[in-house]
Amino acid sequence: MVHYKLVYFPLRARAEIARQIFAYAGQDYSEENLSFEQWPARKNNTPFGQLPILEVDGKPLGQSYAIARYLAREFGIAGQNDTEAAEVDAIADQFKDYLNDVSPYLTVLAGFKPGDKDQLRTDVFVPAFKKNFEFFENILASNHSGFFVGNSLTWVDLLISQHVQDILDKDLAVVEEFKKVLAHRKKVQSIDRIQKYIANRPDYPF
């Protein structure tokens, strides 16, 4: 039997997609959460000098999206065929571009760097959010299933619904115009195993 071990910090952030895939699949795994003080001593022993990593029977896999794609394939939520898998990947890659665009704001919001978060919200976050979530709103409108791709949940549904929840917790105004995105978040987080996972997960700051 395969043993999975997820290594990250005590945060949701980039490891949360893997955790939610495990929860959806009902798959047992272990987790090691490093403190920021422990991290420098472990950094050189990771594939790319960053976290998260997923150890699969002791073999480390780096990069959060690679981990998500691997687990999604293992547990049947990567898309029902190659075309769907490519569509899922395209949406995930667009979402990753969006996160890169808004990272200056999110980094200040989380307290990792100093900065004027109100100005960054106005100049950086809101324009990028509205641009990209209009794309996502239109994709949901054209698919008709309530999911981003096909007729069933894929890993990109978990990825984006969690981010929407994070934004709802901090900034309702920016997301409230995207009705299908909000309905999608509710649909995904109402899935029994995801709902139970969210109700019982640690209360990390982000």
Curated annotation (Swiss-Prot):
Gene3D superfamilies recorded for this chain? Answer: 1.20.1050.10, Glutaredoxin
Question: Where on the tree of life does the source sit, at the highest rank?
Answer: Eukaryota
Alphabetical GO biological process terms? glutathione metabolic process; innate immune response
Q: Which InterPro entries match?
A: Glutathione-S-Trfase_C-like, Glutathione-S-Trfase_C_sf, Glutathione_S-Trfase_N, GST_C, GST_superfamily, Thioredoxin-like_sf
Instruction: Give EC number(s), comma-separated.
Output: 2.5.1.18
Residues in domain GST C-terminal? 81-206
The UniProt function text for this chain reads:
Conjugation of reduced glutathione to a wide number of exogenous and endogenous hydrophobic electrophiles.
What protein name does the entry list?
Probable glutathione S-transferase 6
Query: What organism is the protein native to?
Result: Caenorhabditis elegans
Species classification: Eukaryota, Metazoa, Ecdysozoa, Nematoda, Chromadorea
